[in-house]
């Protein structure tokens, strides 16, 4: 029977199995929702897994306050349309310190507003399992991470002390205070994600489609002028370099730390065609991935997504 399933249907079945397994095994799971394409697919799979019932766990967005405005609008729209139980957490310490990606840099901003914010939220609500939309093809540290990624009481990941995973057998045993991060999309590729979005008609943030947008090139990265806050941190010379270009985003994060790519892809079929030809990583536009060699693995060791 499995042999008759298409590649995408096999991936779908595997992901749904993982999601149901976690819901059955753990006392208090949560699904992390970053509003991006992978989160959209993961949420769609979770709704399928428990249809016609509602999700048996909440959805959580760790908000840095620097997401694209279109992402916030899309999030609120999805929550209303799907009737999601959404938890939003913003690190109050980061807010009190006025942490932002311009003044404090990408590494500190990510550590305080994302990593520490996530750890605060997990501790506050006592979650023992957290679904994430990471895929192994995205980045080398994610390539070696298990589907069930064990975290100690401080939410730290030890890549040298991972549990074996044989076929579809997962070890979910944790002691009090420990937890796991679960990655149901581990075996999907970026192309798989886009083909599934197309076939299933999954709604996504419009930023993924090419359009004329105001951008400025900084250190080889096209940064979109999303709101007035960025203008406060640009010199007059930099402001004079703001131009309109037809761009889209392959990955979405905090807008000052996420680069656009020039593109003509205005539809899902265009994007899929582009994916068949591209030879660059989707995360090439993520500034945080360039903080230093092994920066992503170090972030994950400290508790990052």
UniProtKB/Swiss-Prot annotation:
Quaternary data: Heterodimer composed of CysD, the smaller subunit, and CysN.
Reactions performed catalytically: sulfate + ATP + H(+) = adenosine 5'-phosphosulfate + diphosphate
UniProt pathway annotation: Sulfur metabolism; hydrogen sulfide biosynthesis; sulfite from sulfate: step 1/3
Top-level class of the enzyme under EC nomenclature: transferase
Family: Belongs to the PAPS reductase family. CysD subfamily.
Function recorded in the entry: With CysN forms the ATP sulfurylase (ATPS) that catalyzes the adenylation of sulfate producing adenosine 5'-phosphosulfate (APS) and diphosphate, the first enzymatic step in sulfur assimilation pathway. APS synthesis involves the formation of a high-energy phosphoric-sulfuric acid anhydride bond driven by GTP hydrolysis by CysN coupled to ATP hydrolysis by CysD.
Documented EC number(s): 2.7.7.4
Annotated keywords: ATP-binding, Nucleotide-binding, Nucleotidyltransferase, Transferase
Name of the molecule in the record: Sulfate adenylyltransferase subunit 2
Biological classification of the source: Bacteria, Pseudomonadati, Pseudomonadota, Gammaproteobacteria, Pseudomonadales
A Pfam family recorded for this sequence: PAPS_reduct
Protein's GO biological process: hydrogen sulfide biosynthetic process; sulfate assimilation
Gene: cysD
HAMAP family, sorted: Sulf_adenylyltr_sub2 (MF_00064)
One Gene Ontology term of the molecular function aspect: sulfate adenylyltransferase (ATP) activity
InterPro entries (alphabetical): PAPS_reduct_dom, Rossmann-like_a/b/a_fold, SO4_adenylTrfase_ssu, Sulfate_adenylyltrnsfr_sub2
Organism whose genome encodes this protein: Pseudomonas syringae pv. tomato (strain ATCC BAA-871 / DC3000)
SUPFAM superfamilies for the chain: Adenine nucleotide alpha hydrolases-like (SSF52402)
């Amino acid at each position: 029977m499995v042999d008759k399933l298409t590649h995408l249907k096999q991936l779908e079945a595997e992901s749904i199995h993982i999601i149901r397994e976690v819901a059955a095994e753990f006392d208090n799971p949560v699904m992390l929702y970053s509003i991006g394409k992978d989160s959209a697919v993961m949420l769609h799979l979770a709704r399928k897994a428990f249809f016609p019932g509602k999700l048996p766990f909440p959805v959580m967005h760790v908000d840095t306050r620097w997401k694209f405005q279109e992402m916030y609008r899309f999030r609120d729209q999805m929550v209303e349309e799907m009737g999601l139980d959404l938890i939003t957490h913003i690190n109050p310490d980061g807010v009190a310190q006025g942490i932002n990606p311009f003044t404090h840099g990408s590494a500190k901003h990510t550590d305080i507003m994302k990593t520490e914010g996530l750890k605060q939220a997990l501790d506050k609500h006592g979650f023992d399992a957290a679904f994430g939309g990471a895929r192994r093809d995205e980045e080398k540290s994610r390539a070696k991470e298990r589907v069930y990624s064990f975290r100690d009481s401080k939410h730290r990941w030890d890549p040298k002390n991972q549990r074996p995973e044989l076929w579809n057998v997962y070890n979910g045993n944790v002691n009090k205070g420990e937890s796991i991060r679960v990655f149901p999309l581990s075996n999907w590729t970026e192309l798989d994600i886009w083909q599934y979005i197309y076939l299933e008609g999954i709604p996504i943030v419009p930023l993924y489609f090419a359009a004329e947008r105001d951008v400025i090139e900084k250190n080889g990265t096209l940064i979109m002028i999303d709101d007035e806050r960025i203008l406060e941190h640009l010199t007059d010379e930099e402001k004079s370099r703001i131009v309109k270009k037809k761009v889209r985003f392959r990955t979405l994060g905090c807008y000052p730390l996420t680069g656009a790519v020039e593109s003509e892809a205005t539809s899902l079929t265009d994007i899929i065609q582009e994916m068949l030809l591209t030879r660059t990583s989707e995360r090439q536009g993520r500034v945080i991935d360039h903080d230093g060699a092994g920066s992503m693995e170090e972030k994950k060791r400290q508790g990052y997504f």
